[in-house]
Amino acid sequence: MHRFLFALDPEAAHGLALGLLAFWSERGPLLEVPARLLRVEDPRLRVEAFGVSFPNPLGLAAGMDKDARALGAWWALGFGFAEVGTLTPRPQVGNPKPRLFRLVEDRALINRMGFNNRGAEEAARCLKRFRQRGLPLPLGVNLGKNRDTPLERAAEDYLKALRFLEPFGDYFVLNVSSPNTPGLRALQEGPFLDELLARLRPATPKPLLLKVAPDLSPKALDEVLALTKKHRLQGLVAVNTTLAREGLKSPLAREAGGLSGRPLKRRALEVLRHLAEGAEGLALVSVGGVETPLDLWERLKAGASLVQVYTGFVYGGPLFPRRLLLGLLRLMEAEGVSSLGELRRA
């Protein structure tokens, strides 16, 4: 099946796979029986972050299941949490196709999707149905602004989306770093970000995080850290996709959009280490270029409380979460670490 999907156009393959997973998600016993074989349930993997308990630190990054259609499948496949979105207050179709590209030689993807989604209200209905099933999957909700909303009114979009979705998320992420919505990254700059956080922080008592770009300078990252602390956010998600293209082999490397996967690995780790130096109690969620148990272990040791995957899962297939978590347990045993909680206390 995995090989068949790779023979299709990338966006068509994503749509087909997501449709099948959404169907499977609603099948009750057909979901729960395979979950017993796929999930790695081990108390050593449990994580506490921003007041939420996670069965393991490996999560599905935003972008895979924007509209919260296949949440049961992510639980059954072994993820410790899933982040839906990016969701905007109004539905939007996103950028013209083609807009998703596989760079197989680089184990990477380029996307310029443009926040295509069915809107916050529809996603809220899906999230409500999932919550009623009682499956123990912590959920993050990634929020963005509509393309046609001017920057000076961006906060209103985030607030509108949050009002629909606030009852159903365990934590919320403000996406101000996608390279595929014109002008959006300006919201990472001091004055815009200061105003945005000042308006969003009082809107929910639930954990609020900020997603940052890998292309920020150390000085800009420090400014983001300072504002995150000033407005009492609970953490940062680092990093989004990059505009950089160094060292790529694929003929598709010049396509416009955000690059994810293996080429992002080094920069994602650099940003994580920089943020960890000044985090001072903030939870850090690392994403970008995670492909192996060693990658996962490295992020946790560098200061991440949680780690997300997207492109690695696309290339690694449905057993990818299980392989990473079993490998993580072996690495913990080899280094004499009895629990991830112990690693955090150290």
UniProtKB/Swiss-Prot annotation:
Keywords, comma-separated and alphabetical: Cell membrane, Flavoprotein, FMN, Membrane, Oxidoreductase, Pyrimidine biosynthesis
EC numbers for this chain: 1.3.5.2
InterPro entries listed in its UniProt record: Aldolase_TIM (IPR013785), DHO_dehydrogenase (IPR050074), Dihydroorotate_DH_1_2 (IPR012135), Dihydroorotate_DH_2 (IPR005719), Dihydroorotate_DH_cat (IPR005720), Dihydroorotate_DH_CS (IPR001295)
Cofactor detail note: Binds 1 FMN per subunit.
Membrane topology term: Peripheral membrane protein
Annotated residues for binding of FMN: A62, G63, M64, D65, K66, T86, N142, N175, K211, V239, G261, G289, Y310, T311
Active site positions: S178 (nucleophile)
Pathway stated in the Swiss-Prot or TrEMBL entry: Pyrimidine metabolism; UMP biosynthesis via de novo pathway; orotate from (S)-dihydroorotate (quinone route): step 1/1
Main location: membrane
Binding site for substrate: K66, N111, R112, M113, G114, F115, N175, N180, N240, T241
Catalytic activity annotation: (S)-dihydroorotate + a quinone = orotate + a quinol
Family matches, as CDD domains: DHOD_2_like
Pfam families membership: DHO_dh
Subcellular location: Cell membrane
GO cellular component: cytoplasm; plasma membrane
UniProt keyword Membrane present: yes
Group of enzyme by EC: oxidoreductase
Co-factor requirement: FMN
Molecular functions per Gene Ontology: dihydroorotate dehydrogenase (quinone) activity
Subunit structure: Monomer.
Family: Belongs to the dihydroorotate dehydrogenase family. Type 2 subfamily.
Biological function: Catalyzes the conversion of dihydroorotate to orotate with quinone as electron acceptor.
Protein name: Dihydroorotate dehydrogenase (quinone)
Provenance organism: Thermus thermophilus (strain ATCC BAA-163 / DSM 7039 / HB27)
Higher taxonomy: Bacteria, Thermotogati, Deinococcota, Deinococci, Thermales
Gene name in the database record: pyrD
